[in-house]
Amino acid sequence: MREMPKYVTGKKWRCMTAANWLHRQAMVASRFGHAAFDIFGVPIFGHEEDAADNFATYIMLQFGGAQARRLIGGAAWAWRAYLGDYRRNPVMQTRLAAFASDHGLPQERFYNLACLAFGANKSEFADVQSYLPPTRLPKCSYEYQTLVRAFRKEISPHIDQEMAKRVLDTDWLGSLESGPVPQK
């Protein structure tokens, strides 16, 4: 909350607070990804941080509909400041040290999240097209399906499917002020 502007009040403040909370939920889901990889011995090709981000994105998308949109939107919210308008200014300067981090650049994390969301449900996330470069859009369905196959093979066998259904059927975000509301 320290990074929130002090002058924002009212509805805009509530929206920003909710977005900040939703982004933090995505970060928690990413930590669960790291734990799952370790506990279940999931083999990782590439950066584990990218795989954990993908794990979190997959989990958020499983809620479907409005909950998935809010979760994905909250996760993307924190990276929005880094993006600007790539159409207006497609060239950016980055310090070389940023490429040495075990975490992807915020821009990369945003685009990966957006592409997976669009690949999961083109109609629900149709507005995401305007954020992704046209060269990335055709690959999004494939990227999401690759993630689905990996999750089903490496993670799903370890999940209590009945409990997962109860979790996914709960309206966790109906109101951020009140508690979760189980669906029947």
Listing of model-derived features with the role each one plays in the protein:
Residues 1-21, 32-37, 184:
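Active-site scaffold of zinc-dependent metalloenzymes
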Residues 50-55, 68-86:
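Acidic helix-start/capping segments at beta-turn-to-alpha-helix junctions
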